[in-house]
């Protein structure tokens, strides 16, 4: 498994790569304006192609009571954008 770990913030996307499926190493931070995912998708296309990625792992930050707040809703919207642009499995993890 070659996976990208994604941590979506309000202005940045943290990216880590796992080439073994066991360990992940920091790769880069991508900056965006917080309103459009297009710059992120464009950059991710390059990273995915260059590293033969087959799985995307996206952080889903839940509240302490396991409910979904604003940050989780933002992650779910980004998950939809990833699924629309890539034919890859997108796994959510808290």
Predicted feature descriptions by range:
Residues 7:
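Conserved catalytic-loop position in the HRD/HxD motif
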Residues 2-3, 11-94:
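Phosphate- and other anionic-substrate recognition elements at nucleic-acid/protein interfaces
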């Amino acid at each position: 498994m070659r996976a990208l770990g994604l941590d979506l913030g309000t202005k940045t996307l943290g990216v880590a790569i796992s080439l073994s499926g066991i360990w992940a190493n920091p790769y880069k931070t991508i900056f965006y304006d917080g309103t459009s995912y297009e710059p992120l998708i464009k950059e991710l296309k390059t990273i995915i192609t260059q590293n033969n990625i087959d799985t995307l792992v996206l952080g889903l930050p839940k509240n302490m009571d396991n409910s979904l707040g604003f940050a989780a809703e933002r992650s779910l919207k980004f998950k939809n954008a990833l699924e629309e642009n890539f034919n890859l499995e997108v796994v959510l993890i808290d």
